[in-house]
């Protein structure tokens, strides 16, 4: 991944792995919409790699497509965004209690290779810009050495409204 242009201080090669317990503390998504199983190579304010193990038991495979299961491209982009939210939450030390990270925009989305049951998606996300509570990212989802999807996207931290 290339060097990020961020306004936050950059950490020097601080790598960390993030397990599912911490992911559940960092983002509000739950089954059937939690699309990150673990994260690796976390560098504060810079980058992260999310991992999604795709199984035939995913609910979307029931209708997309019967007899030819393919993960919907928009869900691959969502998985990239969730990976970015984990990076953002950990970098800003935001827990889900009282705050939510919202997906703001997606640009230049491209879908290259289908993702099928049994695939492991490696979601490489890097910060391209950060200001206060808004981050911009570039993400690439890979299966093996093939690019499945890529996009640029943005997210922001907001107070969770009381219902």
Swiss-Prot record:
Keywords recorded for this protein, A-Z: Cytoplasm, Lipid A biosynthesis, Lipid biosynthesis, Lipid metabolism, Lyase
Domain of life, per lineage: Bacteria
Coiled-coil region: none
E.C. code: 4.2.1.59
Main location: cytoplasm
Function: Involved in unsaturated fatty acids biosynthesis. Catalyzes the dehydration of short chain beta-hydroxyacyl-ACPs and long chain saturated and unsaturated beta-hydroxyacyl-ACPs.
Protein species of origin: Caulobacter sp. (strain K31)
GO biological process, one term: lipid A biosynthetic process
Cellular component aspect of the GO annotation: cytoplasm; membrane
Pfam families: FabA
Cellular location(s): Cytoplasm
Official protein name in the record: 3-hydroxyacyl-[acyl-carrier-protein] dehydratase FabZ
């Amino acid at each position: 991944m290339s060097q990020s242009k961020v306004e936050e201080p950059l950490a020097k090669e601080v790598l960390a792995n993030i397990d599912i317990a911490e992911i559940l503390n960092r983002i509000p998504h739950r089954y059937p919409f939690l699309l990150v199983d673990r994260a690796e190579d976390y560098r504060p304010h810079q980058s992260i790699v999310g991992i999604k193990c795709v199984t035939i038991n995913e609910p979307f495979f029931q209708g997309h497509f019967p007899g030819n299961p393919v993960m919907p491209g928009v869900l691959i982009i969502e998985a990239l965004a969730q990976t970015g939210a984990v990076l953002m939450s950990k970098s800003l030390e935001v827990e889900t209690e009282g705050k939510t990270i919202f997906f703001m925009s997606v640009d230049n989305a491209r879908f290259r290779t289908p993702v099928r049951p049994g695939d492991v998606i490696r979601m490489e996300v890097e910060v391209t810009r950060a200001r206060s509570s808004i981050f911009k990212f570039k993400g690439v989802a890979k299966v093996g050495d093939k690019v499945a999807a890529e996009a640029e996207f943005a997210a922001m931290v907001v107070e969770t409204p009381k219902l």
